[in-house]
Amino acid sequence: MGQKIHPTGFRLSISRNWASRWYANDRDFAGMLAEDIKVREYLKAKLKNASVSRVLIERPAKNARITIFSARPGVVIGKKGEDIENLKRELSRQLGVPVAVNIEEVRKPEIDAKLIADSITQQLEKRIMFRRAMKRAMQNAMRLGALGIKIMSSGRLNGIEIARCEWYREGRVPLHTLRADIDYGTSEAQTTYGIIGVKVWVYKGDTLGRNDLPAAVEARTDEERRPRGPRRDDRGARPGADRPAPRVARRPPMGANTAPSDGSDKPAEATGAGAPKPAVQRVRKVAAPAAAADGKGE
């Protein structure tokens, strides 16, 4: 059931990492997890126009470090860093510990699944045709290096009475391959007809480990290669070194005189016990005239 499972949860600890990285005992785990959910909801509402892809929350000893991945870091920082300072104070008040906020820029927002889904939902809320929005997003993703993309929209598309689901795919999106780097994102559009959900899968290629590929091994040049010496066995000599070279019988060239020296009319190749026998020719006998057979002609 590769279509049903969550691509990120399926690849955790293989090619994906957790969005919240901290340890807690059984008593504090639920409370800290609820705090993370509230922080993400707050940042989603606060930075709605900043194109936020994901939020990474880390909790070192009695501190918190929040990394915001955004395609528009200038909107998050604000004029002279005022917005980010206000953000730090609000997050520290919610978590109750000192908070450090880092901003990471998303270089290619066109191939980020979350940003693609948010872009489509914004267009749907502006009453743009969903097929046009989906196909435009797919073209931009394939143009910027994605190997495959799949977009699915569900709900009352174009305001119809019965909700349905439509999806489009371009390229290949291997959902069962664990080493495949599949970026998955969802978003919801609040329309006058109801909620329209958008899911996006983006295939960016294969990866090993947590986005760590082994270094390519360069081939050595001829000058760097060491000359290979003779291989020796237990007796100290190369096996087969004292073996004489095989003798190859040479055949006479085509058109040469191959007549035998004894004067026979057969060629030298045809003489001997193994020579093929000549084919037997059948001669048709001509019958004598009847008069000559009876003796009446004399």
UniProtKB/Swiss-Prot annotation:
* Any one Gene Ontology cellular component term annotated for this protein: cytosolic small ribosomal subunit
What keywords tag this UniProt record? Ribonucleoprotein, Ribosomal protein, RNA-binding, rRNA-binding
Entries under Pfam families matching the protein = KH_2, Ribosomal_S3_C
Q: What does this protein do?
A: Binds the lower part of the 30S subunit head. Binds mRNA in the 70S ribosome, positioning it for translation.
Report biased composition (Low complexity) as residue ranges: 277-298
Q: Which residues form the KH type-2 domain?
A: 39-107
Q: What SMART domains does the database record attribute to this sequence?
A: KH
Intrachain disulfide bonds: none
A molecular-function term among this protein's GO annotations: structural constituent of ribosome
Q: Which family does it belong to?
A: Belongs to the universal ribosomal protein uS3 family.
Where composition is biased (Basic and acidic residues), the residues are: 219-245
Say which species the protein is native to. Albidiferax ferrireducens (strain ATCC BAA-621 / DSM 15236 / T118)
Q: Which Gene3D superfamilies match?
A: 3.30.300.20, Ribosomal protein S3, C-terminal domain
Its recorded name reads Small ribosomal subunit protein uS3
Q: SUPFAM superfamilies attached here?
A: Prokaryotic type KH domain (KH-domain type II) (SSF54814), Ribosomal protein S3 C-terminal domain (SSF54821)
Is DNA-binding tagged as a keyword?
no
* Recorded name of the encoding gene: rpsC
